[in-house]
Amino acid sequence: MITLKEALKLSKDELENFKNDLKAKIEANPELNAYIDIYNIGDGVPIAIKDNIQVKDWSVTSGSNILQGYIAPYNATVIEKMLSAGLSPFGRTNMDEFAMGSTTESSFYGKTLNPHNKDCVPGGSSGGSAAAVGAGLAIAALGSDTGGSIRQPASFCGIVGMKPTYGRVSRYGLGAYASSLDQIGPMTQNVEDAAILYDIISGHDEKDSTSAHKNDKVSDKLNPNRKIRIAVLPKHIQNASEDVKKAYELAINALKKVGHEIVEAELMDAKFDISAYYITATAEATTNLARYDGIRYGNRVVGKDLNDTFVQTRSQGFGDEVKRRILLGNFVLSSGYYEAYYVKAQKTRHLIKDQYSKIFENVDLILSPVAPTTANKFGELSTPMEMYLSDLYTISVNLAGLPAISVPISKSSEGMPIGLQLIANAYDEQTLFDGALSLEREINYNA
């Protein structure tokens, strides 16, 4: 597969031929189920788009039955920026319903397979985007990351996945899960492509009140030879598998070899991250998903009266995991429990942000696992709690609003990809990409 950097240099005719060949290749591999639809419109470089990002005149459903029949009437800001830069949305990729999941098993369209082992999950919620890039069925893709939904599937599928600083990329046109945590980001074959796509989609947007007034670009200033001070977390990785620990040691040695300074640091117990994240995310999801009632748009189940129509539409339209999180969100916001749960979660969130601020007073980057294990087999995570714990290493980054990037490092004893993440201080994407490019070149991962 050609890279994004190479594709941007192709002529119009060369691109057209490439896109037709790519479409044929995708149609010849339907079992992967990475794509929901292939549109192949426009004459720009084709980019796969997660099914929760609005593309005008496309069916956009967030992987849910409740949005069947909805056609997007406008483009998300990231799509407008792509079109202006010579990129074209190519097809919509599968995802966990409303981005609530870590395996892409909860999609209305069925599960997506991991391109490295069809018995394993691709990760989630951006599993379709990760599988498409990992299988050579996309040059690059857009995903969204609420608690690791770009980085974890990128790690599982052996690609690069980047979550920008909160506010760096406009959320206008993104189907909201948890508004204070969501971010759109690039999923690519390599770090340089991620920097290029990040530059294209980032920047201030008046349509998003949380958008940052920062428009600096990184791809034309990449410097893998820059010496960086990087924190490692020896205690934090104790819950990781032996394969992940070996990959972590491999990355540390690679960073030392090229002259980066390695220092030890410590984060608070991750159990506090998980509690704060799921209380915050489900509370916000409860509000965001209240709009889906079958009246204004999407799938409607007609009941005996208006109230019954609401009940039947939401009961039949939402999947089990979405219902579970709506119930949890309503509980933590309810009278008598708001102070005990939601308020404490926000206090914990401030502590998480403060601990990162203190670490970044002395270092430029933090090296961390993305997931405790490699991709699990389908059905292996038998309880919701097991799935939630798989987000152990990613969710604190979203709670603190920081940028992070997953870079493929090695493979497990069973041949499954292992990615690690670099985390930077807020708005320091330049250092993040410089460090990631340096690590990528020294590791020289071969998918």
Swiss-Prot record:
Heterotrimer of A, B and C subunits. The keyword ATP-binding applies. Keywords: ATP-binding, Ligase, Nucleotide-binding, Protein biosynthesis. Transmembrane segments: none annotated. GO terms for biological process: translation. Pfam families: Amidase. It is an enzyme of class 6 (ligase). Belongs to the amidase family. GatA subfamily. One of its GO terms (cellular component) is glutamyl-tRNA(Gln) amidotransferase complex. PROSITE patterns: AMIDASES. InterPro entries: Amidase (IPR000120), Amidase_CS (IPR020556), Amidase_dom (IPR023631), AS_sf (IPR036928), GatA (IPR004412). The lineage of its organism: Bacteria, Pseudomonadati, Campylobacterota, Epsilonproteobacteria, Campylobacterales. This is Glutamyl-tRNA(Gln) amidotransferase subunit A. It comes from the Bacteria. NCBIfam families: gatA. The active site is at residues 50, 125, 149. Allows the formation of correctly charged Gln-tRNA(Gln) through the transamidation of misacylated Glu-tRNA(Gln) in organisms which lack glutaminyl-tRNA synthetase. The reaction takes place in the presence of glutamine and ATP through an activated gamma-phospho-Glu-tRNA(Gln). One of its GO terms (molecular function) is ATP binding.
